[in-house]
């Protein structure tokens, strides 16, 4: 928490460094250097071949997937701050509507600091009128804003809310194998640029029944960004996930937890529920600022110990874990047996809140809590047949729009249900307008043919 002085009406923020998880910027997970010459190429043809190896060097060797050029121009440059594209008329119109409402309802809520988390010289009212999480861990906006409270806990006792930030990670096969072997589903908070970089890994997450949420396009401090950039960071990540997986997420997690009412209002207009956390494992911080791997293990153990001391008799924790590096994934794998032993249930966030329609599309459902704990953890999707009848697929494998439709290239060229926590009349209306922005990409296989200068493996 950024320090405050109770006696001061205005607070001067002098922190010059990121106070949350500064290492969580994406480059640790095989971030590609867009624009450089390709020096590696992995021969993968589909999702299964991408999931076959647990050798990190093999997993994180770049691959190409067609048709790249057909859709690449519909998105911002990967790993650069997103902005609305000049030819994206629908995006521009949707933002104009949202921005008009925002300026009317929250005219005094303005950006804070820099996108890298530097608040030097920033003056902010110590009463926290913007419900700024980074300032005071505020998660419940004032009622007159019309904003939903952030999700921070699981309403079911002795239940661990499982999620992973920063994916998809090119080297996540070992983690996903563990989850699959234990019939364990999670909520995956995906960075848009990572989805573009590693589409087959994103497909695996969705097809194996994990809930997919938004974690912005370029992973920056959102409250430092302009209204337009906040919108673009969320909008294009939704759009990329829709293009790759065929579904439009209705949930998101702000990088570093950095959110305020202005950012919440933009997210809610895109029908995105804000999910924070109650407990941070600090897995992202190992090796920085004096944080050791033992500290991370101790943090996990502290959450586990709460299950034994009565803390979770009325609710459960939402725990911050990361699909960030091999270490952050492996430490979870090590602690998973202890978590299973200590907690009655481990569930994804859609199940925790009985949100049976986790996406804008109504043909994919998430099991509610009662169904999940009975052993039916699979995502169910329905399709309409040519004769007008419908069929239901109750396996954990969904059907993303890119799955099976895009083909690998070997060239070396350069290149909601009523239970939804996000439901509100204002966000619902805006979302109806947002639906059209995805129609043109439905059924198109999104992949990023790699231009790579090298792969950083940590």
UniProtKB/Swiss-Prot annotation:
Acetate binds at residues 165, 256. SUPFAM superfamilies: Glycoside hydrolase/deacetylase. GO terms for molecular function: chitin deacetylase activity; metal ion binding. Residues 1-51 form the signal peptide. It is found in: Secreted; Secreted, Cell wall; Cell membrane. The keyword Cell wall biogenesis/degradation applies. The keyword Metal-binding applies. Its cofactor is Co(2+). Residues 158-348 form the NodB homology domain. It is a lipid-anchor; GPI-anchor. GO terms for biological process: cell wall organization; chitin catabolic process; fungal-type cell wall biogenesis; polysaccharide catabolic process. Co(2+) binds at residues 166, 215, 219. GO terms for cellular component: extracellular region; plasma membrane; side of membrane. It catalyses: [(1->4)-N-acetyl-beta-D-glucosaminyl](n) + n H2O = chitosan + n acetate. Hydrolyzes the N-acetamido groups of N-acetyl-D-glucosamine residues in chitin to form chitosan and acetate. Chitosan is required to anchor melanin to the cell wall, for maintenance of cell wall integrity, and for cytokinesis. Belongs to the polysaccharide deacetylase family. This is Chitin deacetylase 2. It comes from Cryptococcus neoformans var. neoformans serotype D (strain B-3501A) (Filobasidiella neoformans). The gene is CDA2.
